[in-house]
């Protein structure tokens, strides 16, 4: 079956209603029933609970608490690198941005402007730059950390579709990551601006940041834009910046000639938080 045919049912599903319903279930505190669901999920997806701060499934009052569980201390040491992997997951795609075109999958590209909610002025900072698209599967740790130190300047919530973001859907839905609901976080770092985009998906109840909390509840039909004064939110490399309540994808953008990716990186390669993502190449810092 072709990827386009495989994703056809997703066009017909009431994705918003399904996601709202599942989000409410995931937040429910149902005692032994919640624990049973968590145990089933651990067995179904092979979740390694030995890495969790609390490995006991019964310790989590809701499925959301389990899904966003913290890791035990020392579980993810940080590599000595200018840029580290911000998540556990797998590399969907990465590489050069061809002017403003980001590669999604064979036969599919989308623009930085579309990804950033139509803000062409912001997108120009990343023309001919670099991108990385990282997929978090259900079994993965679902907190998102900083690839490098940065000062938050903007956050943009872009409403949209809620297609699945698994590899099959990425191959079958044109412009997937610029169509789905997303939260765009804009930072200034030592090397210049960079962007982390948290992309929503079917059954992703919500996306949250450490400075705001849940961003997309309720889900308004308009773009929302927050600006942050200098020094209000500053995060170091490896610090938590956000989390998914049920998993999804992170897309990162970097300016031209700033980032040299880890030579061992390849599409579909499994990655872990704290591993080397790349090193600083050479660029002239410019504020957004």
Curated annotation (Swiss-Prot):
Keyword Lyase assigned: yes
Pfam families registered for this protein in UniProt: PS_Dcarbxylase
InterPro entries for this protein: PS_Dcarbxylase (IPR003817), PSD-B (IPR033177), PSD_type1_pro (IPR033178)
Keyword Membrane in annotation: yes
Keywords of this entry: Cell membrane, Decarboxylase, Lipid biosynthesis, Lipid metabolism, Lyase, Membrane, Phospholipid biosynthesis, Phospholipid metabolism, Pyruvate, Zymogen
Membrane topology: Peripheral membrane protein
Reaction(s) this enzyme catalyzes, per UniProt: a 1,2-diacyl-sn-glycero-3-phospho-L-serine + H(+) = a 1,2-diacyl-sn-glycero-3-phosphoethanolamine + CO2
Cofactor binding mode and count: Binds 1 pyruvoyl group covalently per subunit.
Cofactor: pyruvate
PTM statement from Swiss-Prot or TrEMBL: Is synthesized initially as an inactive proenzyme. Formation of the active enzyme involves a self-maturation process in which the active site pyruvoyl group is generated from an internal serine residue via an autocatalytic post-translational modification. Two non-identical subunits are generated from the proenzyme in this reaction, and the pyruvate is formed at the N-terminus of the alpha chain, which is derived from the carboxyl end of the proenzyme.
Catalytic site: 88 (charge relay system), 145 (charge relay system), 248 (charge relay system), 248 (schiff-base intermediate with substrate)
Gene Ontology MF annotations: phosphatidylserine decarboxylase activity
Pyruvic acid (Ser) PTM sites in chain numbering: 248
Family: Belongs to the phosphatidylserine decarboxylase family. PSD-B subfamily. Prokaryotic type I sub-subfamily.
Name of the protein in question: Phosphatidylserine decarboxylase proenzyme
Name of encoding gene: psd
């Amino acid at each position: 079956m072709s990827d386009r045919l495989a994703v056809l049912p997703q066009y017909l599903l009431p994705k918003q209603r399904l996601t709202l319903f599942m989000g409410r279930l995931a937040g429910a505190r149902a005692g032994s029933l919640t624990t049973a669901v968590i145990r089933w999920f651990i067995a179904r997806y092979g979740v390694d609970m030995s890495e969790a701060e609390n490995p006991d499934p019964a310790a989590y009052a809701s499925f959301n608490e389990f899904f966003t569980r913290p890791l035990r201390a020392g579980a993810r040491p940080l590599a000595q690198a200018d840029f580290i992997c911000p998540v556990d997951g797998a590399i969907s795609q990465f590489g050069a941005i061809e002017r403003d075109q980001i590669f999604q999958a064979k036969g599919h590209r989308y623009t930085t402007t579309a990804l950033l909610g139509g803000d062409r002025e912001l997108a120009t900072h990343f023309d001919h730059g670099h991108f990385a698209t990282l997929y978090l599967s259900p079994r993965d740790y679902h907190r998102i950390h900083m690839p490098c130190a940065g000062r938050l300047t903007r956050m943009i919530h872009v409403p949209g579709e809620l297609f699945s973001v698994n590899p099959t859907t990425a191959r079958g839905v044109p412009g997937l990551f610029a169509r789905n609901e997303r939260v765009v976080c804009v930072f200034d770092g030592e090397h210049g601006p960079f962007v982390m985009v948290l992309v929503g998906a079917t059954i992703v109840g919500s996306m949250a940041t450490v400075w705001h909390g849940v961003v997309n509840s309720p889900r308004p039909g308009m773009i929302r834009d927050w600006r942050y004064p200098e020094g209000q939110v500053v995060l170091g490399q490896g610090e938590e910046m956000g989390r998914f309540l049920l998993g999804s994808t992170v897309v990162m953008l970097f300016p031209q000639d700033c980032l040299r990716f880890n030579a061992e990186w390849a599409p579909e390669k499994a990655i872990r938080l704290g591993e080397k993502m790349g090193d600083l190449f050479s660029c002239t810092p410019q504020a957004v």
